[in-house]
Amino acid sequence: MAEGQIIKALSGFYYVLSEGRVFQCRGRGVFRKKKVTPLVGDRVVFQATSETEGYILEIGERQNELVRPPIANVEQAILVFSAVSPDFSAKLLDRFLVLVESKRITPIIVISKIDLLDGESKEEIARYVHDYRRIGYDVIETSAVTKGGLDELALRLRGRVSVVAGQSGVGKSSLLNALRPDLRLKTGDISTHLGRGKHTTRHVELLEVAGGLVADTPGFSALEFNQIELDELPHYFPEFRTYGEGCKFRGCLHIAEPKCAVREAVEAGEIPSYRYDHYVSFVAEMKERKPRY
């Protein structure tokens, strides 16, 4: 018996990476009886029946599980947002950050196309970078053209399972191609356009990039907050957690409650006002959704 990780699932076969070799495996019938489906990203115990084939005996406990794309044990999300073309969207980034935080996945913010910045836009992006770093997020500025920031990104990918997410046209494929030129991913191959991945129906595969595994489909192709409860939302804004302990009321939603330490921190300029505005907008969105039964 050996241990490995599923890197591809296709036509009833599971391709397991183990010590640098890939085995084409079938799942045992017991999984069907238990209604358990092995997922890409699963850590498994398998029995090799030849140099290249085998069958899966056990599926390890999952750290997390994404539905779209169907993948397990994602350790980090590379959130790619371009500095320009399309313009940087802090609100969309905050939406992704909430979703990532809710899945207990470590976010890494990558700002691409920094080579295209000029004076005023350079200052604006620098302010955003400063704000998100101050909150505690890992932010990398990159350019697929000048190769700036690529070594730093490669270091983050090493030894981890990552998904890539972000707007359409931000350069996700270009960045992965720059890290591993033989991939030859076409622009648009990894695509999330405000929630609709171009190929969410095709198989998911983990690609070996920079010593780590990266999903070749967009992470979080559904951008709604359907799986998040309203009282959980403040926890997914790390700076709110820090100040929230000073609120008068336990379970403060930081909207209209008296003596709210978070709102006081916003007024004092200690929390970026745009982050708070996005939070208020998300609260309103969640209040409007239909109840789940």
Curated annotation (Swiss-Prot):
Record carries keyword Nucleotide-binding: yes
GO molecular function: GTP binding; GTPase activity; metal ion binding; rRNA binding
All residue ranges annotated as the CP-type G domain in the record: 63-223
Highest taxon above the source species: Bacteria
Gene that encodes the chain: rsgA
Binding site for Zn(2+): C247, C252, H254, C260
Entry's family note: Belongs to the TRAFAC class YlqF/YawG GTPase family. RsgA subfamily.
Any Pfam family matching the protein: RsgA_GTPase
Binding residue positions for GTP: S112, K113, I114, D115, G166, Q167, S168, G169, V170, G171, K172, S173, S174
Species in which this protein is naturally found: Geobacillus kaustophilus (strain HTA426)
Protein name as it appears in the record: Small ribosomal subunit biogenesis GTPase RsgA
Gene3D superfamilies, per database record: Nucleic acid-binding proteins (2.40.50.140), P-loop containing nucleotide triphosphate hydrolases (3.40.50.300), Probable gtpase engc, domain 3 (1.10.40.50)
EC number of this enzyme: 3.6.1.-
